[in-house]
Curated annotation (Swiss-Prot):
GO MF: hydrolase activity
HAMAP family from the UniProt entry: UPF0173
InterPro entries: Metallo-B-lactamas, RibonucZ/Hydroxyglut_hydro, UPF0173, UPF0173_UPF0282_UlaG_hydrolase
Higher taxonomy: Bacteria, Bacillati, Bacillota, Clostridia, Eubacteriales
UniProt KW Hydrolase keyword: yes
Disulfide bond residue pairs: none
A Pfam family hit: Lactamase_B_2
Keywords recorded for this protein, A-Z: Hydrolase
Name of this chain's protein: UPF0173 metal-dependent hydrolase DSY1309
PANTHER family noted in UniProt: UPF0173 METAL-DEPENDENT HYDROLASE MJ1163, UPF0173 METAL-DEPENDENT HYDROLASE MJ1163-RELATED
Entry's family note: Belongs to the UPF0173 family.
Length: 236
């Protein structure tokens, strides 16, 4: 069986390396106190997935698209805005899927907002469409990156229709789900592995990931909690 690597780079940024390609999700690297690498680390990418326009998710995506030639994959409105600043883009929307050279991507809903902050104009906000999550199929495995979201009941449909090898869920609370909601989400999604994200980058989202792992073990032991420090990987 082909092995896939899911490497955490801090906050909500993940690099997924499969047999047919390498993708990066929500590349908030420069200015991220939790990141283990900067954008200069990446010389080849096959896709850059961005869940929404907030600066802690869009991050260095435009620069990386320009440098590597990889398409920035996101909702239509955000794609149009990023293209103005030189990014190569592939626009999609909620519920749609597309097959790329590295695998298949389907956009899911996420309960969150989205604005675009033009490079160098951080006080200027433009509405950037809906926030989203990603269902990614690579090497025959389904991975779910929820983006920034609150808990929603249709996570059960995601889990029912896609046998998830792994899911990345926010646990930071305040802006997204907290620990208890993420554990309940696990009961709906039923992933083999659950990787917490979007916590401890800023004071307002401080959480104890070990506490989350213990809560998951008590409430839903069918999913294995995988706490990754920036730079660490899960091989599946």
């Amino acid at each position: 069986m082909v092995k896939m690597e899911i490497r955490f780079h801090g906050h909500a940024c993940f690099e997924i390396i499969g047999e047919k390609g390498r993708i990066l999700i929500d590349p908030f690297l420069k200015g991220n106190p939790a990141a283990d690498v900067g954008p200069e680390h990446f010389t080849h990418l096959d896709g850059i997935l961005v869940s929404h326009g907030h600066s802690d998710h869009l991050g260095d995506a435009i620069e990386l698209s320009q440098k590597t030639g990889a398409p920035l994959i996101c909702v239509f409105e955000l794609a149009r805005l990023c293209a103005r600043y030189g990014a190569k883009t592939h626009a999609m929307h909620i519920g749609g899927k597309h097959t790329f050279n590295f695998g298949t991507v389907r956009l899911t809903q996420a309960l969150h907002g989205s604005v675009f902050e033009p490079p160098g104009e951080e006080e200027s906000f433009t509405y950037a469409g809906m926030a989203c999550g990603f269902l990614i199929q690579m090497d025959g495995k389904w991975i779910y990156h929820a983006g920034d979201t609150g808990l929603f009941g249709d996570m059960e449909l995601i889990g029912r229709r896609h046998p998830l090898a792994a899911a990345m869920l926010p646990i930071g609370d305040n802006y997204t789900m907290g620990q208890e909601e993420a554990v309940y989400a696990a009961t709906l999604l039923r992933p083999n592995y659950l990787i917490p994200m979007h916590y401890n980058t800023f004071p307002v989202i401080q959480q104890d990931p070990q506490e989350f792992s213990e809560l998951l073990k008590r409430k839903f032991p069918a999913s294995k909690g995988e706490i990754l420090a920036p730079g660490q990987s899960l091989i599946i």
